[in-house]
Structure formats: C-alpha cells, structure tokens
Amino acid sequence: MSIQAPRGFNDILPGEQYGWRDSYRWQRLEEIFREVARLYGYQELRPPMVEYVDLFIHGVGATTDIVTKEMFNITPRGDDPDARRMAMRPEFTAGLVRAWLENGLYNNPQPTKIFAYGPAFRYENVQKGRFRGFHQLDVEVFGAQDPAVDAEVIKLGLDVVARLGLTGLVVSVNSIGCPQCRPRYRQALQDHFRPHLGELCEDCNTRFEKNPLRLLDCKRDADHPAQRTAPVTLDYLCDDCRRHWEGLLSHLAAMGIPYQIDTRIVRGLDYYTKTVFEVLHPKLGAQSALWGGGRYDGLIEIVGGKPTPGVGFGMGMERVLMVLEEEGLTAPFADRPRLDVFVATLGEAARPVGLKLLYALRDAGLSADIDYLGRSLKAQMKYAGKQNSRYVVILGEDEVRQGVASVKHMDEGTQESVPLDQIISHLRRAEA
C-alpha cells in the first residue's frame, strides 16, 4: 500500500533541495512578515482553523465559489449537541471578524490592527500556484475609513516582499462602490449582459440575478466580447466612494507606489466595498496574483456587529515562495541556521562524558547534537559535515582519561586540544 499526501496538499520539508517547500524558507518568510507587521503597529490574532459554515455563508457570500464549490465541510458526530455544520477555513477575514466581535476587541482603543498567518483550505482545481491546502499571511484593520489605511495595507505587503528582494510586481487597483451606488451599477451590468446570457456559462447565468458583479470574475468567459465592453464601476461611484477612490490614488502616489487601474478586479468574495486590489507577478501565469484584498465596510455588521469599516489582504505564501525560487532569489535564505557543535565519541568510556557535554552545550545556548547510531569516528565526522556543523568536539577514551577533548574548527580545518571544563568558554571566544 502506497500512502501519499492528498492531492493539492504539500509537505514542507527541512532542506535546501526542496526548493520553495524548504521549511527554512517558510520560517524566514513568516519572520519577515511578523517583523514588518509589528513595525506598522499590528498585533497577532490566532483564530481556529474551523468555523461554522454559517459564518462563511453570510460573510463571504452564499453564491460565491468558495461557499458553493470549494469549502471543506465537516459533519459533526450524530451525538454532538452542537450539530451545526462546520468547515475548515477557506480564508481568514471572516474568522478574524468573528473573533474580534466574540472577544470584545472593539472595546479596545480603535482602530484594531491585526495580523495572522497559517493554513487555509479550498477544494480547488489543482494547478501551478493553486492548491487545496495553502497558507496565507493576513492583515486586517477594523474601525478606520481613511483611504490612507487602504494604502498602508498595500504598502505593508510590498515591504514584506521587498525584504526578500522581489521586484517587478504590478499593483492593480479598482473601486467597486458601496451599497448606495452599487445598485445602479448592478442594473447597468444586467442590462449589458442580458442579451448575451445564452452565450455565457452556467455560473454566469446563476450570478446574473444574484450577484452580477461576479460576472466580471468569470474565468471561463473572460474573452467573451461582452466582457470587454462591460460597464465599469468607476463610472457609477457615488460622491463618497469617488472621494475615497481619489484619496487612495493620492496616497499611493505620495508613497511612490506605481499602480495600474484594472476595472475588472471585483475579487471573489461578496463582502468587498470600495477599494479592491491585487498584486501580480507574471511568472505565475494564470495564477499571477501573489496577494489581494480590499475594503469591507459592511462585513462586521453582517456578522453581527455594529457598522464598522474594515480593510485588509491575504497573501499566498506558496505563491511568493514559488516566485522567489523562479527568480533565483536565495539571498534572504543564505543565513540558514547551522549546528554549532557536533559531539563525536569513540569508545564506551567516552559516551557518558559526551552526553553530559552535549546537554551542557545546549544549556549554554549552543545548538548541539551527538551520534545515536554507533557510527565510526570517520562516519561521525562525515555526518557532522553534512549537518554543516561549525565545530566537532572529539572525545575518545584517551581524551577522557586526560580530561580534554579535541575541538575541530570545521570551516578552518584546524584542530586543538581543550580541557573539558573549558570547552564552552573556548567555543564562545572562537565565535567572538
């Protein structure tokens, strides 16, 4: 029987040979994200990976692909007193809103600026850059309407990837209006697409009545002539949305962020209002969006709170790491942690002394390891080299009798005898 990971799920593994799946690269990306988020004044919130389906039906949208096609639903046991259906989270924003409300974070000084990261799950058609189990870096701001905040979250994401050396990105922005001006735009879309319904896919026909903005998000009919001539949201914005839109563009220009206006961006979730954006990289082809987000001023009210503005983004970790690999950007991962000391022992008398030294090294804050397979000294040295150890402390029975050990500096190839009770201080001096 051959057991493999489910299709669309990936193992993240220790070792450079695994490319974008190298766990150290993931750790570095997470570290950089945390550092940048904290520089911007964001604090971490860790929501559960499972939420009630109702949260996504009402928050994300009952007609979205996520809810109708892509969620990994969980059916509780029959004897579960709380028998409502649950689902693995397909995205972060709705769960973070729920946590903000349930835990009364609105009572804290506002706005609330939070970040989160971790796995999410969608039953996708697996292809390059699109998986069923994927990971996101997420930031959200609750309680601020200022378009400067929209610009801030865009800049935050750009600062993260800039630390990784990633350039050549395209920031695409649009505004999809608000509940006051969107009805006119919805009507304009329906008037435009109605004569073409017989030529459009089944999904488009379903969306036509329930959420015509999603017609612009269709991948199957993206090249249909009616798509290219469809009305654009910017022509239907109310005065408030237009001021917000112009404010966003002004802030992006002031920050020196190049952008393009793409009126086809509507995002795939129903909660968006006003600003929507995507950051693209051409190396990913059809899945060129590394991250995207926007404003959702009605979501908190939909989930059960008071009317509260919000804005944020979700960045695909897999996609960022895949692009870094394709661009050959390995410098951010060059400072890979090394094993400080490998303790090589030879003979029964040396073994307990080596183990005692091993734990003393670790207690002193030095990473250390020892052979557990009974290998020869030559094999232990070879293994220490593969572990990229800085030093090897060699203990044989003669060294134990003399109260010393041989310390080999692996980078320099030098070796010297050091009293056992001075090993740690010797290594610290060597590193100074």
UniProtKB/Swiss-Prot annotation:
Its EC number is 6.1.1.21. It is found in: Cytoplasm. InterPro entries: aa-tRNA-synth_II, aa-tRNA-synth_II/BPL/LPL, Anticodon-bd, Anticodon-bd_dom_sf, His-tRNA-ligase, HisRS-like_core, HisRS/HisZ, HisRS_anticodon. Coiled coil: none annotated. One of its GO terms (cellular component) is cytoplasm. It holds the Pfam family tRNA-synt_His. Its main location: cytoplasm. It catalyses: tRNA(His) + L-histidine + ATP = L-histidyl-tRNA(His) + AMP + diphosphate + H(+). It comes from the Bacteria. Belongs to the class-II aminoacyl-tRNA synthetase family. This is Histidine--tRNA ligase. It comes from Symbiobacterium thermophilum (strain DSM 24528 / JCM 14929 / IAM 14863 / T).
